[in-house]
Regions:
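C-terminal catalytic/motor cores of large multi-domain enzyme assemblies
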Residues: 1-292
Length: 292
């Protein structure tokens, strides 16, 4: 998205939508909390096209393998780029268009009970492709697990946790007030995925079947995507015969205030089309796609 001159009422990360219809103006006032306005979309995706695609991408034995997560994340952020209302949010009872497209997720340093987690936030460019996103995820994961990268958001939480409880509670209340007005500095929220366009979690990687995650009133994220566990499902083939194919359930939790049902339905159709045709993700993400 092109840089615009900042005006009174704009945030550092978003532009205030001034010319809006009465419904969207009123909704932020009478329904001020994001977590009270969740809508849930459940979709089952056939993984066979994605399996063929990542097998081709991994054919030459690259060290950091392409996975379903890379394809799903890239398809989702391309959907957000092509369907810009998905990149909106309400904050402090106002309606905003985010200036950038970002994707947030949590990295588990080790698959062990006592293992720490770190937060990652990717900035997605219009010219990005699945290859560039794959490499950025590789860098984030490697830096996190090798503990070479200082995450200012994680560090800020550690500082607050080290304070006496009454001081940390007072500090957090002040930070929440800053958050409400869009004044939180980057050293506090720079890598917080709750400020992303898309917050995505691969629960299937830890063998959880859950397809729902709540939105939060902290931050600005209006779209949460859960990737479930892969499973074999009986599906009809092109000849009308039933065969077992691998599928995954995706759960999308969205803020119903930012767009209407028709807009969401059309966006989901685009998202699923991209997952059925993953080679399209090798093109710049801003490139339009004929899907209807």
């Amino acid at each position: 998205m092109a840089e615009q001159k900042r005006r009174w009422g704009d945030r550092r990360d978003a532009t205030l939508l001034r010319d809006v219809d009465s419904l969207h103006f009123i909704m932020g006032i009478i329904y001020p909390n994001r977590a009270d306005n969740e809508a849930y979309i459940a979709e089952r995706v056939n993984l066979e096209p994605i399996k063929d695609y990542i097998a081709t991408k991994n054919y030459e034995g690259i060290p950091f393998k392409y996975t379903f997560f890379h394809v799903i994340l890239t398809a989702l952020v391309k959907t957000v780029i092509l369907r810009p209302k998905l990149n909106r949010f309400y904050a402090n009872e106002n309606y905003y268009q985010r200036n950038k497209v970002t994707a947030g997720f949590v990295i588990k340093k080790e698959f062990a009970d006592g293992s720490e987690e770190a937060m990652a936030l990717l900035e997605i460019k219009p010219e990005s492709t699945i290859e560039t996103i794959h490499e950025e995820i590789h860098q984030e994961v490697a830096a996190c697990r090798e503990q070479k990268k200082v995450n200012t958001t994680d560090n800020s939480m550690n500082v607050l946790n080290s304070l006496p409880r009454f001081l940390s509670k007072a500090a957090v209340r002040f930070i929440r007030w800053l958050d409400k007005h869009g004044w939180c500095p980057d050293f506090l929220i720079g890598k917080d995925p709750n400020y992303s366009s898309v917050f995505i979690s691969n629960l299937g990687s830890i063998h959880l079947k859950s397809r729902y995650h709540h939105l939060t009133n902290w931050g600005t994220s209006s779209l949460f995507c859960i990737i479930g566990e892969k499973k074999w499902t009986p599906l009809y083939d092109e000849h009308g015969l039933v065969e077992m194919q691998e599928t995954v359930d995706l759960g999308l939790t969205v803020d119903e205030r930012i767009a209407d049902g028709y807009y969401y339905a059309k966006s989901v159709r685009l998202f699923k089309y991209l997952l059925e045709h993953p080679t399209l993700l090798e093109r710049p993400l801003s490139e339009e796609v004929e899907y209807e």
